[in-house]
């Protein structure tokens, strides 16, 4: 049920009937204040200007043609030409009843698209660190949202599994192959392994020569080198999967589409760019000059697609990547959850992709960029010693802090119940603190704020859900067997129902813009409206049975909306806190 869309269609029809030009937009939005109704149509001024009419005159004509009988109880013209629409309480109650009866809460399935979502993208032979957190959890929230709406989503974990460093790693793996630990080494050891390999490469000329030879062999498909390379990849991805599982992220090994996947395509792409006259030789390298981007001298910027020594760059891989996602995966839309510092690089690659005809304009290429995670000092979040914080260590600390918090609040909890609750709250706090911020901005990582039981935090939202669910437990009522109809006679009943019925509008916005903070803000508002309703409107102690039944249904719809919304974010809920 998309009330905004229903009203928008009605206002658009009324605009046409009033003689507005084709394409005039209704611009229907939820009203910011209750005195302006539940929805407001803001498109009158623009249409009136095109028609040469006073806005209020056009607004009067639109209202005269507005077919909202049964949907709106009142329609008013305000200010220079805004149309305020007040929803009919009986109609709204019927929609809320229908939403509660629907496992999807009234959210319609969309016409499915094939959408590729590129996110997480850790590097092989290195442990995941806090810098991977935002891409991983924001991307996964987008995936969950798109799948809920019915899209065919292809997860693409663009793992850094290729490059000259693998010659060095293979050479060192060969050197220590006799060690019984090597085959199953933990990734923490593999980080030390990487440092030792680099040290040998820098200090031992013979080792460096052998490493360079292995790069050539690996790129040539040498079976021995491929086997050693695969071992390094497998060790890394096993550890990464543990992080994904702890984070309640839906990525698996089946979603890995590493850089190595695109290597066979690179020579053909460079040759094709040359044949199309897009790439030229410049100082021994193959370069695409783009008029859309200018260097400091104001000249077209040169983007290297093949180095003088024959090697390829990330841009070449990203060109192949976009081409593959359209031609092989059949993408209608491709979303990249990569930090904002990569924006120009991606724009250059996509400009080449479009010019070469690899991806048509009908396919959307979208950089859903995000800012940095900062410490309280406003600098990139690091250890006290200035080092990179490992993601696993961050999650361990989140659980430790949540354990202390919950032990202080609920000392009677113990055993498996306590362990499960601590993990849900600790991991949820880290994720929600990130997801609740506008992804385009930097944000301050603050343990005290994210674990607080007040404000727009995971603990508050998880508690809000359990608070609603506890109503049914206390009364011994199964929320799936509720009888009667929803009626909305109190102001706070209607305010809660109106916001609950905007769930579809919210989830469509998140899917369109890739902005999970919009869902967080919505759920936080729903929780607040429920608190106001709960305080003002007795539920179990309502004087009339019909009112009690109605309010129980509103509570059930609230609980299901909170749970479903949090699930689209990848945040778990519990029945008791």
Swiss-Prot record:
SUPFAM superfamilies: Anticodon-binding domain of a subclass of class I aminoacyl-tRNA synthetases, Arginyl-tRNA synthetase (ArgRS), N-terminal 'additional' domain, Nucleotidylyl transferase. Its EC number is 6.1.1.19. A motif ('HIGH' region) lies at residues 122-132. One of its GO terms (biological process) is arginyl-tRNA aminoacylation. One of its GO terms (cellular component) is cytoplasm. Keywords: Aminoacyl-tRNA synthetase, ATP-binding, Cytoplasm, Ligase, Nucleotide-binding, Protein biosynthesis. It holds the Pfam family Arg_tRNA_synt_N. SMART domains: Arg_tRNA_synt_N, DALR_1. GO terms for molecular function: arginine-tRNA ligase activity; ATP binding. Monomer. Belongs to the class-I aminoacyl-tRNA synthetase family. This is Arginine--tRNA ligase. It comes from Edwardsiella ictaluri (strain 93-146). The lineage of its organism: Bacteria, Pseudomonadati, Pseudomonadota, Gammaproteobacteria, Enterobacterales.
């Amino acid at each position: 049920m998309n009330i905004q869309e229903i009203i928008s269609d009605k206002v658009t029809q009324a605009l046409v009937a009033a003689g507005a030009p084709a394409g005039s937009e209704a611009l229907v939005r939820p009203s910011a204040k209750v005195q302006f109704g539940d929805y407001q149509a803001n498109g009158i001024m623009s249409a009136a200007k095109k028609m040469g009419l006073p806005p209020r005159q056009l607004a009067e004509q639109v209202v005269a043609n507005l077919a909202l009988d049964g949907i709106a109880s009142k329609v008013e013209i305000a200010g220079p030409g805004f149309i305020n629409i007040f929803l009919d309480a009986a109609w709204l109650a019927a929609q809320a009843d229908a939403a509660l009866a629907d496992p999807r809460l009234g959210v319609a399935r969309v016409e499915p698209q094939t959408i590729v979502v590129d996110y997480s993208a850790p590097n092989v032979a290195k442990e995941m660190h806090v810098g991977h957190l935002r891409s991983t959890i924001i991307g996964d929230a987008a995936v969950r949202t798109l799948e809920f709406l019915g899209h065919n989503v292809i997860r693409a974990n663009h793992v850094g599994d290729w490059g000259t460093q693998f010659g060095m790693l293979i050479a060192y793996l060969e050197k220590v192959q006799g060690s019984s630990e090597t085959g199953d080494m933990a990734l923490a050891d593999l980080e030390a392994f990487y440092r030792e390999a680099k040290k040998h490469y820098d200090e031992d000329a013979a080792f460096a020569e052998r490493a360079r030879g292995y790069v050539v062999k690996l790129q040539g498909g040498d079976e021995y080198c491929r086997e050693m390379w695969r071992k390094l990849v497998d060790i890394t991805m096993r550890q990464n999967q543990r992080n994904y599982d702890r984070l309640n992220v839906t990525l698996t090994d089946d979603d890995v589409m590493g850089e190595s996947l695109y290597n066979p395509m690179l020579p053909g792409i460079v040759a094709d760019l040359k044949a199309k006259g897009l790439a030229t030789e410049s100082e021994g390298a193959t370069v695409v000059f783009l008029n859309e981007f200018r260097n400091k001298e104001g000249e077209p910027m040169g983007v290297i697609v093949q180095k003088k020594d024959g090697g390829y760059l990330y841009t070449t891989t990203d060109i192949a990547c976009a081409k593959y996602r359209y031609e092989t995966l059949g993408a209608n839309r491709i979303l990249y959850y990569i930090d904002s510092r990569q924006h120009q690089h991606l724009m250059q690659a996509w400009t080449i992709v479009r010019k070469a005809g690899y991806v048509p304009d009908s396919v959307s290429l979208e950089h859903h960029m995000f800012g940095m995670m900062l410490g309280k000092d406003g600098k990139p979040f690091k250890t006290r010693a200035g080092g990179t914080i490992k993601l696993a260590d961050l999650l361990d600390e989140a659980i430790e802090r949540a354990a202390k918090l919950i032990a202080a609040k609920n000392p009677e909890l113990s055993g498996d119940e306590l362990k499960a609750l601590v993990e849900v709250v600790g991991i949820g706090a880290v994720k929600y603190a990130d997801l609740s911020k506008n992804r385009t901005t930097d944000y301050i990582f603050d343990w005290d704020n994210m674990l607080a039981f007040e404000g727009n935090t995971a603990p508050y939202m998880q508690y809000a859900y359990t608070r609603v669910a506890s109503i049914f437990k206390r009364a011994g009522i199964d929320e799936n067997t509720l009888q009667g109809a929803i009626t909305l006679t109190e102001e706070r009943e209607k305010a809660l129902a109106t916001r609950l019925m905007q769930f579809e509008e919210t989830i469509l916005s998140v899917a369109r813009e890739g902005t999970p903070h919009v869902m967080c803000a919505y759920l936080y508002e729903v929780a607040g409206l429920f608190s106001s309703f709960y305080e003002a409107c007795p539920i179990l102690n309502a004087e009339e049975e019909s009112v009690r039944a109605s309010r129980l249904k509103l509570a059930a719809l609230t609980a299901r909306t909170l749970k479903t919304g949090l699930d689209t974010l990848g945040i778990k809920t519990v029945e008791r806190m």
